Amino acid sequence: MKSKPYLILFTLLVMAACQPKIELEPVDIGAAEVAVTSILDNYHAAMIAGNANDCISFLGNNGLYCGTDPIEIWDKETFSNAITEAMADTSFSINYAIDKRIIRIAGDGKTALALEQFTMNAISEKIPIRLISHLMKTDENWTIDFISWSLIPLNEDIPKLNKALE
Protein backbone atom coordinates (compact mmCIF):
# COMPACT_ATOMS: atom_id res chain seq x y z
CA MET A 1 0.00 0.00 0.00
CA LYS A 2 2.86 2.36 0.85
CA SER A 3 4.49 1.76 -2.50
CA LYS A 4 1.49 3.02 -4.50
CA PRO A 5 2.24 6.76 -3.99
CA TYR A 6 5.88 6.11 -4.90
CA LEU A 7 4.81 4.27 -8.03
CA ILE A 8 2.58 7.18 -9.05
CA LEU A 9 5.37 9.67 -8.34
CA PHE A 10 7.87 7.59 -10.31
CA THR A 11 5.44 7.32 -13.25
CA LEU A 12 4.92 11.09 -13.27
CA LEU A 13 8.66 11.73 -13.18
CA VAL A 14 9.26 9.36 -16.09
CA MET A 15 6.46 10.98 -18.09
CA ALA A 16 7.83 14.46 -17.41
CA ALA A 17 11.35 13.41 -18.36
CA CYS A 18 10.17 11.91 -21.63
CA GLN A 19 8.50 15.08 -22.87
CA PRO A 20 10.20 16.60 -25.91
CA LYS A 21 12.09 19.79 -25.20
CA ILE A 22 10.85 22.76 -27.14
CA GLU A 23 13.68 24.75 -28.61
CA LEU A 24 12.88 28.43 -28.82
CA GLU A 25 14.33 30.31 -31.72
CA PRO A 26 16.52 33.20 -30.64
CA VAL A 27 14.85 36.56 -31.10
CA ASP A 28 16.68 39.51 -32.59
CA ILE A 29 15.26 42.25 -30.36
CA GLY A 30 17.24 44.92 -32.21
CA ALA A 31 15.74 43.94 -35.57
CA ALA A 32 12.26 43.87 -34.05
CA GLU A 33 12.77 47.35 -32.61
CA VAL A 34 13.89 48.64 -36.02
CA ALA A 35 10.77 47.11 -37.63
CA VAL A 36 8.44 48.60 -35.00
CA THR A 37 10.12 52.00 -35.33
CA SER A 38 9.57 51.87 -39.09
CA ILE A 39 5.86 51.02 -38.66
CA LEU A 40 5.38 53.87 -36.19
CA ASP A 41 7.30 56.35 -38.37
CA ASN A 42 5.18 55.40 -41.38
CA TYR A 43 1.95 55.61 -39.36
CA HIS A 44 2.82 59.13 -38.19
CA ALA A 45 3.92 60.18 -41.68
CA ALA A 46 0.52 59.06 -43.01
CA MET A 47 -1.24 61.00 -40.21
CA ILE A 48 0.68 64.18 -41.02
CA ALA A 49 0.14 63.72 -44.77
CA GLY A 50 -3.58 63.24 -44.20
CA ASN A 51 -3.56 59.83 -45.88
CA ALA A 52 -6.37 57.94 -44.15
CA ASN A 53 -5.92 54.74 -46.16
CA ASP A 54 -2.26 54.46 -45.21
CA CYS A 55 -3.09 55.12 -41.52
CA ILE A 56 -5.74 52.42 -41.58
CA SER A 57 -3.40 49.92 -43.25
CA PHE A 58 -1.29 49.75 -40.08
CA LEU A 59 -4.23 48.82 -37.82
CA GLY A 60 -5.00 45.29 -36.65
CA ASN A 61 -8.45 43.91 -37.42
CA ASN A 62 -9.33 43.10 -33.80
CA GLY A 63 -7.74 46.19 -32.31
CA LEU A 64 -8.93 48.66 -29.71
CA TYR A 65 -8.34 52.34 -30.39
CA CYS A 66 -8.89 55.10 -27.83
CA GLY A 67 -9.04 58.84 -28.50
CA THR A 68 -8.52 61.68 -26.04
CA ASP A 69 -12.22 61.89 -25.10
CA PRO A 70 -13.56 59.32 -22.60
CA ILE A 71 -16.28 58.23 -25.05
CA GLU A 72 -13.76 57.57 -27.83
CA ILE A 73 -13.23 53.82 -27.50
CA TRP A 74 -13.40 52.28 -30.96
CA ASP A 75 -12.95 49.10 -32.91
CA LYS A 76 -11.01 49.24 -36.19
CA GLU A 77 -14.04 50.06 -38.33
CA THR A 78 -15.21 52.96 -36.15
CA PHE A 79 -11.68 54.33 -35.74
CA SER A 80 -11.10 54.03 -39.49
CA ASN A 81 -14.31 55.96 -40.16
CA ALA A 82 -13.24 58.70 -37.73
CA ILE A 83 -9.81 58.99 -39.39
CA THR A 84 -11.33 59.03 -42.87
CA GLU A 85 -13.88 61.69 -41.91
CA ALA A 86 -11.29 63.91 -40.21
CA MET A 87 -8.85 63.66 -43.10
CA ALA A 88 -11.54 64.29 -45.73
CA ASP A 89 -11.73 67.86 -44.41
CA THR A 90 -8.92 69.53 -46.35
CA SER A 91 -8.83 72.43 -43.88
CA PHE A 92 -7.89 69.92 -41.16
CA SER A 93 -4.15 69.95 -40.85
CA ILE A 94 -1.95 68.32 -38.27
CA ASN A 95 1.73 68.63 -37.76
CA TYR A 96 3.87 67.22 -35.01
CA ALA A 97 7.22 65.66 -34.32
CA ILE A 98 7.84 62.85 -31.86
CA ASP A 99 9.70 64.29 -28.87
CA LYS A 100 10.13 61.02 -27.01
CA ARG A 101 9.74 57.38 -28.01
CA ILE A 102 10.31 54.29 -25.89
CA ILE A 103 9.80 50.83 -27.38
CA ARG A 104 9.75 47.58 -25.45
CA ILE A 105 9.83 44.31 -27.38
CA ALA A 106 8.47 41.18 -25.68
CA GLY A 107 10.94 38.35 -25.10
CA ASP A 108 9.32 36.22 -27.79
CA GLY A 109 9.69 39.05 -30.33
CA LYS A 110 6.00 38.90 -31.28
CA THR A 111 4.60 41.93 -29.47
CA ALA A 112 5.80 45.41 -28.66
CA LEU A 113 4.73 48.32 -26.51
CA ALA A 114 5.49 51.85 -27.67
CA LEU A 115 5.24 55.11 -25.75
CA GLU A 116 5.45 58.32 -27.76
CA GLN A 117 5.14 61.92 -26.61
CA PHE A 118 4.61 65.01 -28.73
CA THR A 119 2.62 68.22 -29.04
CA MET A 120 0.05 68.34 -31.83
CA ASN A 121 -1.14 71.72 -33.07
CA ALA A 122 -4.61 70.40 -34.00
CA ILE A 123 -5.34 69.37 -30.40
CA SER A 124 -3.33 71.69 -28.13
CA GLU A 125 -0.16 73.69 -28.50
CA LYS A 126 0.30 73.75 -24.73
CA ILE A 127 -0.68 70.28 -23.53
CA PRO A 128 1.48 67.39 -24.74
CA ILE A 129 0.07 64.09 -25.93
CA ARG A 130 1.19 60.66 -24.84
CA LEU A 131 0.40 57.96 -27.38
CA ILE A 132 0.58 54.37 -26.13
CA SER A 133 0.54 51.69 -28.82
CA HIS A 134 0.69 47.92 -28.74
CA LEU A 135 1.92 46.14 -31.83
CA MET A 136 1.63 42.49 -32.76
CA LYS A 137 3.68 40.50 -35.22
CA THR A 138 1.89 37.87 -37.28
CA ASP A 139 4.01 36.01 -39.78
CA GLU A 140 6.46 38.76 -40.77
CA ASN A 141 4.08 41.74 -40.49
CA TRP A 142 3.61 44.12 -37.58
CA THR A 143 0.22 45.73 -36.95
CA ILE A 144 -0.98 48.20 -34.35
CA ASP A 145 -3.70 46.50 -32.31
CA PHE A 146 -4.03 49.08 -29.53
CA ILE A 147 -3.72 52.87 -29.45
CA SER A 148 -4.49 55.25 -26.60
CA TRP A 149 -4.18 59.00 -27.12
CA SER A 150 -3.93 60.94 -23.84
CA LEU A 151 -3.44 64.59 -23.02
CA ILE A 152 -0.73 64.86 -20.36
CA PRO A 153 -0.64 68.26 -18.72
CA LEU A 154 2.14 69.05 -16.30
CA ASN A 155 1.14 68.26 -12.72
CA GLU A 156 1.58 71.94 -11.85
CA ASP A 157 -1.00 72.87 -14.52
CA ILE A 158 -3.77 70.58 -13.23
CA PRO A 159 -5.14 73.12 -10.69
CA LYS A 160 -5.29 75.72 -13.49
CA LEU A 161 -7.20 73.29 -15.71
CA ASN A 162 -9.59 72.42 -12.88
CA LYS A 163 -10.21 76.14 -12.27
CA ALA A 164 -10.84 76.73 -15.99
CA LEU A 165 -13.40 73.91 -16.04
CA GLU A 166 -15.51 75.33 -13.18
What are the residue ranges of the model-derived segments?
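A mature extracytoplasmic/lumenal domain signature
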Residues: L59, D69, G107-G109, E116-T119, ...
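Hydrophobic pocket/interface hotspot
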Residues: Y43, D54-I56, G63, F79, ...
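N-terminal secretory signal peptides that target proteins for export/translocation
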Residues: M1-K2
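Short beta-strand edge/turn micro-motifs at domain boundaries
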Residues: Q19-I22, P128-P159
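Surface-exposed, charged secondary-structure patches
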Residues: S80-S124
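Sec-dependent N-terminal signal peptides
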Residues: P5-M15
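Short, low-complexity N-terminal intrinsically disordered segments enriched in polar/charged residues
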Residues: C18-N53, S57, K163-E166
